[in-house]
């Protein structure tokens, strides 16, 4: 019998790659504060993403997920957010024109502050210190004070994520995502880079289409869809106390949502069927990404998918494949066939992380 799910039922499971907070009272104060903070995303937006992912599963859309391996406090700057957003938009226009389907844009942004490590200890010369686990947990500087697991960093991460999401919303709906503007960026890229020359013919065709649309009176001035775009945020749901603090009930449906992101994923190191991360993710209504590596056991993977998506909901599961170009053609097709043949799994998506 499956135990009753709550945002904290994962605490009864083995939780790997979690920080060791020595000051428990401080941790409780931080979590109490986080629970009172506004959500970063809304349930309706999450449902919109799930619907878009469902279209991808039916071959009527394409998922583009891109962003840094990890965000940092030190490199936080509006120009970096703008440039990342801009590149994703440029990629999406090329992909959409070439494929003829809508591109679902998901950034690894506004929350990707924690990373699992192969070893909990880092050694330099004769000094051993806790490994750097991401700015949400400790500092990258190699000294005792920096490497302490500090719960206050969760509040710092939230503040940066909130600022990032606020700017992304402004970019997405404030005119910066105008299709004609994106095309000018692409044309500039074609002219100024060696790599861009490969896309010259495609870029010219897009320009011709935009020119024709303009001659027909179809421009961003009178068609809102040409000046705005949907943009979603995602991160790895690694630090479970943080994720739990932002898991709220949607007043319109009664369902639970992790409001720290539109989509979260489970990493290759935390994908255990009876582990804490799978337990947490099985109860939230967000789309869930699952990392798939070259050593993944498809039988175990099917069990994990069934645990998280027992009702075979469309748009719920996203497979994030990390195998490299030399292995993906040999390994992944067989895994995908096995997964599709399993009754609990009908809708999966493939996304390739970029840096």
Region roles according to the model:
Residues 2-58:
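N-terminal basic/disordered segments at the start of proteins
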Residues 42, 66-67:
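N-terminal signal-anchor module of multipass membrane proteins
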Residues 48-50, 274-277, 304, 333-335:
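Glycine-rich, charged/polar anion/phosphate-binding loops
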Residues 59-61, 285-287, 314-316, 344-347:
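A general structural motif
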Residues 318-319, 325-345:
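Non-transmembrane, aqueous-exposed alpha-helical and coiled segments at domain scale
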Residues 348-354:
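Conserved small/polar residues in nucleotide/adenosyl-binding loops
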């Amino acid at each position: 019998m499956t135990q009753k799910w709550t945002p904290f039922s994962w605490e009864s499971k083995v939780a790997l790659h979690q920080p060791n907070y020595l000051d428990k009272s401080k941790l409780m104060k931080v979590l109490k504060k986080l629970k009172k903070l506004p959500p970063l995303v809304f349930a309706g937006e999450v449902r919109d993403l799930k619907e878009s992912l469902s279209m991808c599963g039916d071959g009527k859309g394409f998922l583009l997920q891109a962003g840094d391996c990890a965000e940092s406090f030190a490199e936080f700057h509006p120009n970096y957010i703008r440039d990342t957003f801009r590149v994703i938009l440029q990629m999406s226009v090329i992909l959409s024109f070439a494929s003829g389907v809508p591109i679902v844009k998901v950034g690894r942004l506004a929350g990707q502050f924690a990373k699992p490590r192969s070893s909990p200890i880092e050694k330099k010369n004769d000094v051993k210190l806790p490994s750097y686990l991401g700015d949400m947990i400790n500092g990258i500087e190699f000294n005792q004070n920096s490497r302490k697991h500090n719960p206050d960093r969760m509040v710092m991460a939230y503040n940066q994520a909130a600022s990032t999401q606020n700017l992304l919303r402004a970019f997405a709906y404030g005119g910066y995502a105008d299709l004609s503007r994106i095309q000018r960026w692409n044309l500039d890229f074609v002219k100024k880079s060696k790599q861009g020359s490969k896309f010259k013919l495609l870029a010219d065709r897009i320009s011709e289409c935009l020119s024709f649309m303009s001659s027909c009176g179809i421009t961003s001035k009178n068609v809102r869809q040409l000046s705005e775009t949907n943009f979603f945020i995602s991160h790895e749901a690694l630090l479970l106390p943080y994720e739990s603090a932002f898991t709220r009930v949607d007043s319109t449906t009664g369902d639970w949502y992790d409001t720290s992101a539109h989509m979260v994923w489970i990493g290759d190191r935390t994908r255990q069927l009876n582990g804490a991360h799978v337990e947490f993710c099985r109860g939230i209504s967000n789309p869930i990404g699952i990392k798939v590596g070259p050593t993944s056991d498809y039988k175990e993977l099917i069990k994990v998918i069934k645990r998280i998506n027992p009702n075979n909901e469309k748009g719920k599961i996203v497979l994030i494949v990390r195998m490299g170009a030399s292995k993906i053609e040999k390994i992944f097709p067989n895994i995908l066939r096995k997964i599709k043949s399993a009754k609990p799994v009908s809708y999966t998506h493939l996304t390739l992380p970029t840096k």
